[in-house]
Amino acid sequence: MPKETKETKKYKVEDEFAKAEKTSFVHIPSIKLDTSTLANNFKSLNKNIIPSGKLDYDNDNNENNNNNNENKHIDKRPQLISKKDKRKQKKEAFLQKFNPSLKLQKKKQQDDDESNDGLGMGGVLSSIDLLKDSMKLQPKTKGPKLTNEKRKKMSLKEANQYKNVLSHPSFKANPFATLQEHLANSVALQNQKIKQEQDFKPNNNNNNRNKLKRK
């Protein structure tokens, strides 16, 4: 068997590399890179496109992290109200119902709405509200029980009144103004009755006291 020399070993290495370049699946091409063409192309690029200086990515990331941390610390749960504050709110709401200054402001606002309203609906609504308030203040008393005949008479009477109102010339000319005047008059009558009843009660109490003293 012949001995292997340095030359035979060299040929074997070359053959192995030659075999590695060609496989049964892929042929690996040999590419030569021309550095001069790359350098020329790089010089021809527009320098304005390439950003100058360092981009400060770290500061942006730090700002975003700080904002996220601040949002995490914000408590989005509904705040609980103590019993003392609840009682205070209820008391204020109760006092506002009986505050005369608030009623005057409400009436003034309604008057302004009436002046702005072409049809005069604001005045009608304000007089309706006043009538409701006076009806609430009036003490409730149980009236006599109505029979069927009395109910029929009342319904006929109301139907006739309704027809008379519709046929009235002032109602035909300006129905909203007529309703407003009627409601204002009814409110004045209700207030007058309430005042008379309140004045009548102290007089009765004084008379009863005088009678007891005489006895």
From Swiss-Prot:
It is found in: Nucleus, Nucleolus. One of its GO terms (biological process) is maturation of SSU-rRNA from tricistronic rRNA transcript (SSU-rRNA, 5.8S rRNA, LSU-rRNA). It comes from the Eukaryota. The keyword Nucleus applies. GO terms for cellular component: 90S preribosome; nucleolus; preribosome, small subunit precursor. Involved in ribosome biogenesis. This is Putative ribosome biogenesis protein slx9-like.
